[in-house]
A protein has these predicted regions:
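Repeated scaffold domains used in trafficking and secretory/extracellular systems
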Residues: 58-63, 103-109, 146-154, 195-208, ...
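Short loop/turn segments that connect beta-strands within beta-propeller blades
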Residues: 83-87, 132-136, 178-183, 230-234
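Short coil/turn segments at the loop-to-beta-strand junctions that recur within blades
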Residues: 51, 93-101, 142-149, 191-196, ...
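Blade/loop signatures of beta-propeller domains
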Residues: 3-47
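Short beta-strand elements that form the blades of beta-propeller/WD-repeat-like
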Residues: 18-20, 65-75, 116-122, 158-169, ...
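Blade-loop segments of beta-propeller domains
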Residues: 48-60, 78, 82, 87-115, ...
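Loop-centered beta-sheet repeat module
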Residues: 173-231
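Asp-box/WD-like beta-propeller blade repeats and closely related beta-sheet repeat scaffolds
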Residues: 103-104, 121-173, 184-196
Length: 264
């Protein structure tokens, strides 16, 4: 990479933010990147062949959560929990209309080993389902706003939720912080990020691969967009990365890694 041409520059915005702007027209060639560029080690885990362990469907979110000793994967028959060796433990929740069930799919999840909890966010809903790691339902967390294709981060020490939401025109907030009782602490209105008219083929990306909480919108319609970082002190989304497509934007989304941005 050190011999590759420079295709991006840092730009200072009127608000004083530093944003990296990639000029797509400067990309003239392709290179082969070894996997070791992005990871120092990896492990393949066989999830087994037992009927109850089979992942039958991952559409409608396909949420996967990995912690040091657990793997959680959404399947059409529930959210399946495995240990780090791939041994099936149990299923959490199920599709239905019960108090601990979801209507369509599990869209995001988080495993908190320290506190023996798994948190599941349905694709559409007003609560986060909570289970212990043995599969027992716990009191749910009410959401301050309803979510659509949302993402979340749990601060288990402060007992806070950071929730990202699809910025539809009727969405109350596109990002907010709340406590575990549902009390709203901070929020950001969608503003210029609004998707009008609402289109469920769009999505949001919150990769959480760095110490920053990143946020970007995937548009099914070709458009120019930006990857943001949440600035908690100022309670705003600060621009961090974008691509200059000139007059010909292509279908894409962004993923942020500790030392790289991926455009795919």
């Amino acid at each position: 990479l050190k011999d590759s041409p420079v295709v991006a520059q840092q730009v200072i915005t009127l608000n004083g933010d530093t944003i990296i702007v990639c000029d797509l027209s400067l990309l003239k060639d392709t290179i082969d990147l070894p996997l070791s560029t992005f990871v120092s080690d990896f492990e393949l885990v066989d999830l087994g062949e037992d009927e109850e362990a089979l992942i039958k469907e991952t559409s409608g979110g396909g949420s996967i959560a990995v912690s040091p000793n657990y793997i959680g994967i959404y399947s059409g028959t529930g959210y399946k929990l495995f240990d780090k060796t791939g041994k099936y433990i149990t299923s959490l929740s199920a599709r239905g209309q019960g108090p601990n069930e979801y209507a369509f799919s599990i869209y995001d999840s988080y495993i908190d080993e320290k506190n023996d909890r798994a948190y599941l966010l349905p694709m559409n809903g007003n609560k986060i389902l909570v289970y212990d790691l043995k599969g027992n339902a716990q009191p749910y967390i009410p959401l301050a706003h309803e979510t659509t294709k949302g993402k979340f981060y749990v601060d288990d020490q402060k007992k806070l939720l950071y929730v990202a939401n699809m910025p539809f025109s009727d969405t109350a907030s596109t990002f907010w912080i709340q406590d575990f009782e549902g009390k709203l602490i901070k929020e950001i209105i969608a503003g210029h990020l609004k998707i009008v008219p609402p289109d469920f083929s769009n999505d949001i990306n919150v990769s959480m691969n760095t110490e920053e909480i990143d946020y970007s919108v995937f548009h099914w319609k070709n458009t120019v967009d930006t990857l943001y970082h949440y600035n908690e002190a100022d309670n705003r989304l600060a621009p961090s990365f974008t691509v200059n497509f000139k007059d010909n934007p292509i279908l894409h989304d962004y993923i942020e890694l500790p030392d790289y941005y991926l455009i795919r």
